[in-house]
């Protein structure tokens, strides 16, 4: 892909697709502006280069029609604060009003379009809507890695009509990190997969078995794997219909000589409650009336040892119900072990990213991805629609 820095943007209208799908409270105040901060380097560069910067994003799920609850106005205000310059807010994302606003822009001006999902054509990857977006710009920049797994009009079809397309700096960083970790990893390569459901991670597990030297499985999804090995997991959450698939993963790991690590002890309680009585037990001694809610201390040590000599680590999914302090120790221990390793480390997925921040080790992770679904699809070996679209339309 051609680098943004090789394109002359001075005086040009540049449409930047960002992901400003940020959490808002009841007063429409932003509670976490990480995604806005992540896009600032690209926007600042374009402003400094004298471009007329048109920023577009979605927010929430407004069902293809305007809804003031999902207005991007709060993000425009925050972006203006971060850039230390005014950011004008449009009333819509396409149409005569937007065209006239852009016509009045001077080099270095920034305009935020209203929520793309207020238009039904966005989610449908609609050609007419994509043409209307492309008509607003001379250069299209995609800096929204976190939505690059969705074939939406502003990510996919727009690249068919925009005169010039390029990835933004965040997109370049994301793809560079994943290229280093997944396409040409230094070995030993270890993947850590956690979270609640085998069903959501199964394609990733199946692909990772072709790539990794070691596979660590934790979180509630590990219960299904333990059950597949004949362990009685008490009242722990399992996906009965996927026990066969779990057995298949265990068998394939053995066939491919991938070291597979599962919990050897767990923290159990009779209910999901921060004040519930809890204890660490071996996985073969889980009480019939209890459920596993975190990995135990022996497992934390086992997983930590499996990471010590790793050269590449990719982690997606917590080891327990880490949002409750009572069941957070396992996830924090793994976060510390990942941070302590000498490996190139990539962490992604909302819960996992929150965990490394809460564990106080975020500054010692090589790369923290902004992508959730996009991160997972790369772990599945898929080509992301947004990335394929950029590759399809490149300046000669």
From Swiss-Prot:
Q: Which reaction does it catalyse?
A: (2R)-3-phosphoglycerate + ATP = (2R)-3-phospho-glyceroyl phosphate + ADP
- Look at the named UniProt entry and state the broad enzyme category this protein falls under: transferase
Q: What is this protein called?
A: Phosphoglycerate kinase
Which GO terms are recorded in the biological process aspect for this UniProt protein? gluconeogenesis; glycolytic process
* Quaternary structure and interacting proteins, as annotated: Monomer.
User: CDD domains from the xrefs?
Assistant: Phosphoglycerate_kinase
Citing just one GO molecular function, the answer is:
ATP binding
Which organism was this protein described from? Desulfosudis oleivorans (strain DSM 6200 / JCM 39069 / Hxd3)
Q: What is its main location?
A: cytoplasm
**InterPro entries in UniProt:** Phosphoglycerate_kinase (IPR001576), Phosphoglycerate_kinase_CS (IPR015911), Phosphoglycerate_kinase_N (IPR015824), Phosphoglycerate_kinase_sf (IPR036043)
Organism lineage reads as: Bacteria, Pseudomonadati, Thermodesulfobacteriota, Desulfobacteria, Desulfobacterales
UniProt similarity note: Belongs to the phosphoglycerate kinase family.
Q: What is its EC number?
A: 2.7.2.3
Q: Which HAMAP family match?
A: Phosphoglyc_kinase (MF_00145)
Give the UniProt entry's GO cellular component terms.
cytosol
User: Which amino acid positions bind ATP, per UniProt?
Assistant: 201, 323, 349-352
Pathway membership: Carbohydrate degradation; glycolysis; pyruvate from D-glyceraldehyde 3-phosphate: step 2/5
UniProt subcellular location = Cytoplasm
Q: Which residues bind substrate?
A: 19-21, 35, 58-61, 117, 150
Source organism, top-level taxon: Bacteria
